[in-house]
Regions:
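Conserved helicase NTPase motor core
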Residues: 22, 27-46, 57, 76, ...
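Switch/connector loops and helix/strand junctions flanking conserved nucleotide-binding motifs
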Residues: 85-88, 112-115, 175-176, 277-280, ...
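Proline-centered turn/helix-capping motifs that create local helix->coil transitions or kinks
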Residues: 171-179, 266, 321-327
Length: 327
């Protein structure tokens, strides 16, 4: 497992006396939430199951950082939906003030898009590239599939949806197409050569038409970080505090993006549920959350265990099931 070495934080915080805080954090949060919110410097893993106040914890931590004097734009909040980040920042603004609205928040893809809009020419793209959504990507693959005359009465070729699933999963899991075919589509193994041809032409089509699909946004951001050290350092310096929601649902590419951004200040906090991952079909891996303490030296782990939604009887059943769970 690759281990990222992070430099000591150079972030400077104002020393604020508890009586000077606008928010009474200690009385408004339970002990575990308070620990997570007030643990500011260094890498942190917050284990938070459903109903334990995960969102509340993130909202209060955003407010706490702003109260400590961190410029909102230097805080990066990455979530799985734009709506989630907007709601968290809205709540933080109500909790503290309008400064929280200036926090940099959004999805991994929207963040990648914003960076690549500025630096895409360094990767061989023209400014103003267009983005293919999943439906567009499937249609392009179908066009190539048809032009190659791969689907005949004698031999059925995978539909565009299957082709896209194979291609996207291969990228997001960093796994060879052969391995995915063997595991999930063994009846298509003999067609691997033709599929590889479709994928190669798909990549050529995108480059010829100045297009990126959703997977390219992540791939190209990582490529930018790897090839342009000065730009990676600039962004890693700019974002002094990084928070990631639903970390158990991140894939290998997203985990690497977080690692690159955290190499200067060391202030990376990820929040997730180590017993739940619902996006494995998109390449999400629970290993990201399980391996986080080993990847980030000096990581502090905080567990939010007080549940505000379920009855104790339900929690007892859930805990008994989890005792026998496997990865």
């Amino acid at each position: 497992m690759k281990k990222f070495t992070l430099k000591k934080s150079s972030s400077e915080l104002h020393i604020v006396h508890p009586q000077q805080f606008v928010i009474d954090y200690k009385n408004e949060l339970n002990p575990s939430q308070y620990d997570a919110v007030t643990s500011v410097s260094g890498p942190h893993l917050i284990i938070a199951g459903a109903g334990t106040g995960k969102t509340r914890t993130i909202v209060y931590r955003v407010a706490r950082l702003v109260e400590l004097g961190v410029k909102p734009e230097h805080i990066l909040l990455l979530t799985f939906t734009r709506r989630a980040s907007q709601e968290m920042l809205r709540r933080a603004s109500i909790l503290l003030d309008h400064r929280c609205e200036k926090v940099s928040g959004g999805t991994f893809h929207s963040f990648a898009n914003s960076v690549l809009r500025k630096y895409c020419t360094l990767l061989g793209y023209e400014r103003g590239f267009s983005i293919l959504d999943q439906s567009d990507s499937e249609d392009v693959m179908n066009l190539i599939r048809t032009r190659l005359k791969l689907d005949t009465k004698e031999r059925r070729f995978p539909r565009k949806e299957t082709l896209h699933d194979l291609y996207s999963r291969s990228i997001n899991t960093v796994t060879a197409v052969t391995a995915i075919l063997a595991a999930d589509y063994p009846h298509y193994l003999e067609l691997e050569g033709d599929m590889t041809k479709v994928f190669a032409l798909y990549i050529e089509y995108k480059r010829a038409h100045n297009l990126m699909d959703y997977d390219d946004l992540l791939l190209n951001l990582i490529r930018l970080f790897r090839e342009q050290e000065a730009i990676r350092a600039e962004l890693a310096t700019y974002y002094k505090y990084i928070m990631v929601d639903e970390y158990q649902d991140t894939n290998k590419l997203q985990s690497e993006i977080v690692a690159h951004l955290g190499t200067i200040h060391h202030n990376v906090m990820v929040v997730g549920d180590d017993s739940q991952s619902i996006y494995s079909f998109r390449g999400a891996t629970i290993r990201n959350i399980l391996d986080f303490p080993d990847q980030y030296e000096g990581c502090k782990v905080v567990k939010l265990e007080e549940n505000y939604r379920s009855t104790q009887a339900i929690l007892n059943v859930a805990n008994e099931i989890l005792k026998h769970a496997i990865e």
